[in-house]
Swiss-Prot record:
Keywords, sorted A to Z: Cytoplasm, Fatty acid biosynthesis, Fatty acid metabolism, Lipid biosynthesis, Lipid metabolism, Magnesium, Metal-binding, Transferase
Name the UniProt record assigns to this protein: Holo-[acyl-carrier-protein] synthase
Family matches, as HAMAP family: AcpS
Gene Ontology terms for molecular function: holo-[acyl-carrier-protein] synthase activity; magnesium ion binding
Catalytic activity: apo-[ACP] + CoA = holo-[ACP] + adenosine 3',5'-bisphosphate + H(+)
Gene3D superfamilies in the record: 4'-phosphopantetheinyl transferase domain (3.90.470.20)
Main localization category: cytoplasm
One Pfam family hit: ACPS
Alphabetized InterPro entries for the sequence: 4-PPantetheinyl_Trfase_dom, 4-PPantetheinyl_Trfase_dom_sf, ACPS, Ppantetheine-prot_Trfase_dom
Family statement: Belongs to the P-Pant transferase superfamily. AcpS family.
Organism: Syntrophotalea carbinolica (strain DSM 2380 / NBRC 103641 / GraBd1) (Pelobacter carbinolicus)
């Protein structure tokens, strides 16, 4: 029977990413986000909330995992993508995927939103 094996939340000020964009700090965005994520966000009229909510999802994942960016995890090992119905999913790769599996987690659930000045994400892990 599945059980709750991890939980993480994160809240991000959208203005933080608006400042990165206004200052042309593309190196930060390239370090934090995959090419697919950057393309998706930059295609939006206001990309800042979309970057912020993706960053919140990655931070929430790291909190649920309990590792932060240790053990070789990179920001680009985590990517927020849309499933065919439009729901955001967090896709793992590299060390993030390996640690997730090695620690006995079998399913990852993501809920995220942005409104006003903030972006928020919650990540829940299930184990067997």
């Amino acid at each position: 029977m599945p059980y709750l094996s991890g939980l993480g939340n994160d809240l991000v000020r959208i203005q933080r990413f608006r400042r990165f964009l206004e200052a042309g700090k593309t190196a930060i965005l390239e370090r934090l986000f995959t090419e697919e994520e950057r393309s998706f966000c930059l295609a939006k009229k206001d990309p800042a909330p979309h970057f912020a909510v993706r960053f919140a999802a990655k931070e929430a994942f790291l909190k649920a995992l309990g590792t932060g960016l240790r053990y070789g995890i990179r920001w680009q090992d985590m990517a927020v993508v849309r499933n065919p119905e439009g729901k955001p999913d967090l896709v793992l790769d590299g060390e993030a995927a390996r640690l997730f599996e090695d620690r006995g987690h079998v399913r990852l659930l993501l809920s995220c939103s942005h409104d006003g000045d903030y972006a928020f994400a919650t990540v829940v892990f299930e184990g067997n």
